[in-house]
Amino acid sequence: MGSIIISALLALVIGAVVGFFVRKSIAEAKIGGAKAAAEQLIEEAKRAADALKKEALLEAKDEIHKLRTEAEHDIRDRRSELQKQENRLMQKEENLDRKDEALNKREALLEAKEEALNERQQHIEQMESKVETLIKQQQTELERISGLTRDDARHLILERVEKELSHEIAMMVKEAETRAKEEADKRAKAILSLAIQRCAADHVAETTVSVVNLPNDEMKGRIIGREGRNIRTLETLTGIDLIIDDTPEAVILSGFDPIRRETARIALDKLVQDGRIHPARIEEMVGKARREVDEHIREVGEQTTFEVGVHGLHPDLIKILGRLKFRTSYGQNVLKHSVEVAFLAGLMAAELGEDEMLARRAGLLHDIGKAIDHEVEGSHVEIGVELATKYKEHPVVINSIASHHGDTEPTSVIAVLVAAADALSAARPGARSETLENYIRRLEKLEEIAESYEGVEKSYAIQAGREVRIMVKPDMIDDLEAHRLARDIRKRIEEELDYPGHIKVTVIRETRAVEYAK
């Protein structure tokens, strides 16, 4: 048993020793392989490091070469720029040298001129001294010979010169006044003609009677009433004469006051429509008619101010303005006349650069006094000035009202324009009844003269008789004949008619060729 154990121990020891040596040899073999591998790795690392070192050296050399090249190029550029600057500085220096030389020459020349001027000044002063001495000697000699002092001689010469010049100045002033007057006349005519052509105003002939139509003649008896009480009541309340004659189905109202006449017409119309006609009903209808007329007057005033473009009038003044519709002057409606004057004055003011709206306002109100001149003492000019002052109108408007008939001196251009527009509107052919017949006769005579020639188809007198247009037959009158016809008609007008201004004769020859495509 013991031997077995010993044998086992010996085997174990021997196995351990053998295992130790085996492991040692294996470890040494591994260590040797590792060393060889490490040496190989070290060698490869050395080779890689050498390659990197060479590559880095090459890159460094390339960078150094590149930097050197750039530096050399930069140095060359700087040298070139410095050379250019040096050249420019040298050029400037040369220019400065030349300028300095020129300035030196100029300074020398100026010094020479100054010296010459000083010498000339001294010479002039010497000459002036000699001249003064000679003048004094001559004055003394002249005073001795003429027996006049210097002041007396001056006065004598000035008087002679003044006499000679005064005549020349007077002639020049007269010529200037003549030219100015001619130019002013031309300008005034141009402005007036333009204003007249641009102003288109309608006109209605006014009469002193109104006619009320009746449904039948039996109504006349009802209007007269028992023992004439109805007609007397109506005449008493309105102040209008009722004329009931043989005129069928009509009653004539006659009166000088258009407002009363209009009141009577409205009242009578209402009575006829109502059918109940007796004094109490008449009084009621007359009251209604008066209120309607008052309202109509106010509306007319407002419409007129709107039409003319005048704003800001006092309400009472607007109502007074509306009353002008029922006033006439030589048959011309005063409200229409005032509107026409307003537009004419405004047009002329615009041409002259004046306030057009203020001129319209003054023209519209210039005859405002005529609305109540039959109710208040004084002329329509005085009443108009009082009204305009009362309602605080513009001073130019007040002066225009006061001066439009020459009673007061105009203080503004607008006042003069209003007076001119008033004269134009009143004198316009056809505006007032006293000139209407002559005006129509002259227009008819113009057309009669034109149509008396063979080949004339139709003639028209237009522009208030300032032009006649003749339409001729083209198959009878050629172009040359048209000129001859115009001259012949012009001669006959000059020989046979009396007219203001001039008349334009226009011959119109028209040929038409018409075809129809089917």
Curated annotation (Swiss-Prot):
GO CC, sorted alphabetically, is: plasma membrane
Q: Which intervals hold domain HD?
A: 334-427
One GO BP annotation is: mRNA catabolic process
UniProt-recorded Gene Ontology molecular function terms = RNA binding; RNA endonuclease activity
> Any idea of its EC number?
3.1.-.-
What CDD domains does the entry give? HDc, KH-I_RNaseY
| Primary localization class, coarse | membrane
Annotated InterPro entries: HD/PDEase_dom, HD_domain, HDIG_dom, KH_dom, KH_dom_type_1, KH_dom_type_1_sf, Ribonuclease_Y, RNase_Y_N
Q: Which domain of life does this protein belong to?
A: Bacteria
Which terms are listed as keywords in the entry?
Answer: Cell membrane, Endonuclease, Hydrolase, Membrane, Nuclease, RNA-binding, Transmembrane, Transmembrane helix
Q: Where in the cell is it found?
A: Cell membrane
Kindly give the SMART domains that the UniProt entry links to this protein.
HDc (SM00471), KH (SM00322)
Q: Which Pfam families match?
A: HD, KH_1, RNase_Y_N
> Its membrane topology, per UniProt?
Single-pass membrane protein
KH domain sequence ranges = 208-271
Q: Where are the transmembrane segments?
A: 2-22
- Which PANTHER family does this one have? RIBONUCLEASE Y (PTHR12826:SF15)
Q: Name the protein family.
A: Belongs to the RNase Y family.
Q: What does this protein do?
A: Endoribonuclease that initiates mRNA decay.
The protein depicted here goes by the name Ribonuclease Y
Which organism is this protein's natural source?
A: Geobacillus thermodenitrificans (strain NG80-2)
| This protein's encoding gene | rny
